[in-house]
Regions:
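Hydrophobic alpha-helical transmembrane bundles of multi-pass membrane proteins
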Residues: 1-224
Length: 224
């Protein structure tokens, strides 16, 4: 999934950003020629729905959503497909699934946007598309040949949970595209939801007679 940072970033600069946020073509996809190679994406211009931040900053903020989406899918077929096939999958996924869905949902002239669909921080564009793609990949590949699963290293789990929890502040609060009340509400909701879910998971482990563990608290926090 680390390769998603390299492949998707380059693809984003080349054409994917234009496909997502360029002038709308039928409300389905953007015109890639408008912002090809980031033409017109400068620090002196701004996206129409984010007038308080530079266009270049907005473009790279959105790039992080595009990067994380195929990375989320990786777990469904990790170690079961060839490396080059995975790279090809990422390119095709971004161009033919992520870009149209992003444009229709987040572009003011997009089809879903015009219908009133609200996706504040990627519930549809990121998580739904990644979930369905992962499910399709898992069904196509079938069960793993090796069923043995090595125990997770709790140190890495704790570190990953902390990074993920903190990183979600950027995704959720940052989606307000400004230092404003909406960003504060998103940050507060993210914090309380993760904390409450982590605590609830620990309590339910205790009630059900399971061993209370840091692993359970981490799983609960991520679920929240």
């Amino acid at each position: 999934s680390f390769m998603a940072m390299t492949v998707v970033t380059v693809l984003w600069v080349l054409v994917a950003f234009g496909l997502c946020f360029g002038p709308s073509i039928g409300g389905i996809i953007g015109d890639p020629t408008k912002n090809f190679m980031f033409q017109g994406v400068t620090i002196t211009s701004a996206w129409e729905l984010a007038p308080t931040i530079p266009f270049l900053l907005f473009a790279f903020f959105q790039a992080k959503f595009a990067i994380i989406t195929p990375a989320l899918i990786t777990g469904a077929f990790a170690e079961r497909i060839r490396f080059w096939a995975y790279l090809l999958f990422m390119v095709l996924f971004i161009l033919f699934i992520y870009a149209p869905l992003c444009h229709m949902t987040w572009h003011p002239d997009g089809l879903f946007f015009q219908w009133g669909v609200l996706d504040f921080a990627g519930g549809t564009v990121v998580h739904m598309s990644a979930g369905w793609a992962a499910l399709a990949g898992a069904i196509f590949l079938g069960k793993r040949k090796v069923q043995k699963v090595n125990p997770a290293r709790i140190t890495y789990v704790l570190l990953g949970t902390g990074l993920l929890w903190f990183g979600w502040f950027g995704f959720n609060a940052g989606s307000a595209v400004g230092a404003n009340g909406l960003a504060a509400q998103a940050l507060a909701t993210t914090t309380v939801a993760a904390a409450a879910a982590g605590m609830a998971w620990v309590f339910f482990d205790k009630i059900l007679g399971h061993k209370v563990s840091a692993m359970g608290a981490c799983i609960g926090a991520v679920v929240g």
